[in-house]
Amino acid sequence: MYLVDTNVLSEARRGRSEARNWLRSVDPTTIYLSVVTLGEIMKGIALRLRTDAPAAAALTEWLERLRHDYRERILPISDLVALEWGRLAAERPRGMADALIAATAVVHQKIVVTRNTSDFADTRIPVINPWNL
């Protein structure tokens, strides 16, 4: 079971073969998203809206498709995830989004799929980089 980081989804949307090929190589029912990923995408949409409304609209449609397609596989920030986030944040400074995704993976026993493996270094979770396969 996999927890896919935002960068993998974004790169697949842009047509990057490494991300697309990896996503196509696994059973789609084993792919999960974090609510943090939805928030990161929404942040990108809000920023894009300031300068390029048509692009923001296209991203909004993509976000809604993701929400629909993964509706049963979007993992929340629960109390257990929050506690694990606190432990990870105390170990070393890292971005809040990455730490929450890492904590979600720990609690739900998922493999993180990301291009940014260094963001998840020194956690006790397995990581796959589709660009290194």
PLM region spans:
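Short, well-structured N-terminal submotif of metal-dependent ribonuclease cores
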Residues: 1-37, 47-65, 133
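Active-site neighborhoods of divalent-metal-dependent phosphate/nucleic-acid chemistry enzymes
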Residues: 43-48, 57, 68-115
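Residues at the C-termini of beta-strands that transition into short coil/loop
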Residues: 35-36, 78, 116, 131
